[in-house]
Amino acid sequence: MSGLTSVREAEDLWQKIQLRRCKREQERLKHPDVELRDGDFRLRGLVAGERVLEWEFIENETGTCTLQLSLSHYLAKWVMDHRGRAKRNVIINIEKQGARWTGMMDHYRVIKTDAGDAYIEIVFLHDFEQTKHIRVWCNPFLRPELQFPKVWIIFGPAKWCLLVTLFVNLLRLETSLWTLPDDPTDINEWMGPSFNPANWRNIVKPFPFLADNSPVTMVFSRFGTFYDTAKKILEDHQLTLTCRRYIKDRDPHPFEDLKGLWGIDPVEDLLQKIPLRDGCVVWDIEDNSGWGTQTAFGGSWLTGFVRGMVQLAGDGQVEGVDVFTGDYTFPGEYYSPWFMGTSPIAPHVVFEEGPLTGIKSSEFSYYEATDTSFLAGGQSAPGINEGISALVNIGGDLLTSFINSQLAALGAVGGAIDLPPLGGLLDAVLQPLYSDVFGAFMEVPTLRAMGISLPISGLEDIVTGLGDFHYFENMADGAMKAFTLSAFAAIASQIHKTRARTTHTLKVSDAAPYIFAPKPYGHCWIGDRVGTSVLGYPVEHQLFVERIRKVKYRIDKDGMKPLEIEIGYREPKNPALHILEEIKRVNGALGTAGIL
């Protein structure tokens, strides 16, 4: 503040800051704007006087919204009259502090209590639910009767692969490629006019391929839902799939923030001129991982966050964290007084345990390791049954040759007898006896009973063991061939499930002191990294870095309730298990495609 030259200027600046904080607090406490719209996204009314309104944002999952209205409410009558309105779908739009929650009605219930109270309860599902109703075709450009290749496969950066997969299937749905449109009476839905994006109900936000810093992966599916196709990739790479409806005359063009990303002015100007219909769902993926850049994975109150760099392991996607010892750099937006939010490069939001902090409730759990030896199998390893069968067939055929040669020595009588090969007969008789007997099971011991280090932040150098008294054996679920990739992956998975591990979840209050809202309205939002401490943790001042998983709002007869914020600890991945699972996943895709 070297520009201040008098006490008066300092007081004016102080008053300006306090006014800005007051406006921010008023915006936080303001009642949300709630609208009900029909199936064509036409406004039918503003909701006021509701009995209960509860809605939640969940990262990469479908949130729900519950709205309770009195039966005398005009919108309650409109919702109940599903036969009387032309477009039966009901869409809710809730706006608060820049966050927009939209979704379609799943069902409604008319409830009467013992006390004679009656009301309607309407349940909505967030627009994210659409990902569970979009199928990833093997070839979105062909009819279902002719699908070649056998499976949809795309390789590249995770964000780009997922958005391309979603786009080509939305293109198929929105343009009615080689199929009858949803509404045959609407000429705009037929092939030709349907290529106009102004008629689309969904669109994918474009972005430059070279700007995608997410890890490389393979996306594949054979008529699975996009939700199932993307779920594991989103979780592994800490990506957040977002969807937000565009409302004309209220929102800037959703592609406006792409200015400067491409470096090609004509392309950027063209993107901002793409017409979008009112209510169009704009899909995008936010990368909150800080992959390939320095970020925080833990630290303490004394030393601050310890920066680390995410490194690629042998499987191309497993996280390995190296401590960053260079000069720390901070995002340029942190130096702007108008910026609100946090960056994965240098997260600044930290919640401390204590009686007067924003943490309402927390749960830190430690699970002890159990078994020390693991079994898998049920079927003989590849080649064993087949080898025994071949030996039995060869032995039977040799026996047949020997018998026939002995019979031939008997002269005219023996020459008239020629036995067929007995190998197949003997194999059929003996197969139930030798099948899955040799090499049908495998055992993998562990060293958990001896001294090992604990997988807990701050305690890695303390060597401990389970002791002489411990659990003995466990077995991988399901029957499988022993000594195969599937068997090793199953055992690795079982070892990973029964390892010593920790979990950490919290519920924190809003504005204590951080505001939960999207940029630029709040300090942190869904998917952002934040720091937390653990009550009574053996390492004093230890900090963990978690990600925000869920934000839940509730309004009832007593007004706005405190936010429920859930912050979850992401357990580290087992690199060996991840490699085996990835190889198995890729082999399955290539096998389905007929390549392997």
Swiss-Prot record:
It comes from the Viruses. This is Minor tail protein Gp28.
